[in-house]
Amino acid sequence: MKIIVPATSANIGPGFDSVGVAVSKYLTIEVLEERDEWLIEHDLNPRIPKDKRNLLIKVALQLAPNLQPYRLKMTSDIPLARGLGSSSSVIVAGIELANQLGKLDLTDDEKLDWANKIEGHPDNVAPAIFGNLVISSVFKGAVSSVRADFPECSFIAYVPKYELKTRDSRSVLPFKFSYKEAVAASSIANVAIAALLQGDLVKAGRAIESDRFHERFRQKLVREFPNIKKLAKKHGAYATYLSGAGPTIMILAPKDRAKLIQTRIEGCKYNGEVFILDVDRDGVRVEF
């Protein structure tokens, strides 16, 4: 059995802690033979545990404490601590592992409830579960989400070599907004989502780049952001935004402009990689 979970790009400008989209990089968990103790084989960061201390197993055992241990193989091309939902993908995989091995028969909404409790916010875990574009809210502990088709376009991701921890990225945010600022910021988010739902990427792009919730505070943590945003706009991009807490910079562009934008960014010789990604429409899936 294989469990496959997509990467995710959260916030998308003004959709702070609420909006996310699944994209085409993946975490894969292969379930092999039964064992007396959990073993997770991987060639990822050496700091990632290979036993029951791994986040994958910790999550699975929260849902099903008496799971039979297995030998697992973990592979991933999702960059770690870069704003592409690497930890969220592991959380969703752990929930699905418990669901399958423990025969829990969870609905997608139940998976999201669990994932939100563990992660603390739904913007990454929701699209990892449902696929596509997902808009979520949490009120009095209850998660509500809406899945929709993301308009056809390419995602060009510039992924720096340096990490940016979520806690560090959150530390630069203000503790409060004035009522006037909150109204302005939420109205921009409303337009961004409505335009995405209508497939109007030009109007959506303007709203995405007008975010007032977080990007103006976080941009100073990602030194390449201003130049890449300017370059992308020059070559026909709809929008450039910080993916999640950063430092990945995500560009939305027409498919016929993606390769050009990728080449131009690579020509800047920044210390990072550039990927062209697509929307993942499926979310977490299981292959037998």
UniProtKB/Swiss-Prot annotation:
In terms of InterPro entries, this protein maps to: GHMP_kinase_C_dom, GHMP_kinase_C_sf, GHMP_kinase_N_dom, GHMP_knse_ATP-bd_CS, Homoserine_kinase, Ribosomal_Su5_D2-typ_SF, Ribsml_uS5_D2-typ_fold_subgr
GO BP annotations listed: threonine biosynthetic process
Query: What Pfam families does this protein's entry cite?
Result: GHMP_kinases_C, GHMP_kinases_N
Q: Where does ATP bind?
A: P79, L80, A81, R82, G83, L84, G85, S86, S87, S88, S89
Identify the PROSITE patterns for this entry: GHMP_KINASES_ATP
Protein keywords = Amino-acid biosynthesis, ATP-binding, Cytoplasm, Kinase, Nucleotide-binding, Threonine biosynthesis, Transferase
Q: Where do transmembrane segments lie in this chain?
A: none
Q: Name one GO cellular component term.
A: cytoplasm
Where in the cell is the protein located?
Cytoplasm
Q: Which family does it belong to?
A: Belongs to the GHMP kinase family. Homoserine kinase subfamily.
The entry's protein name is: Homoserine kinase
Lineage of the source organism? Bacteria, Bacillati, Bacillota, Bacilli, Lactobacillales
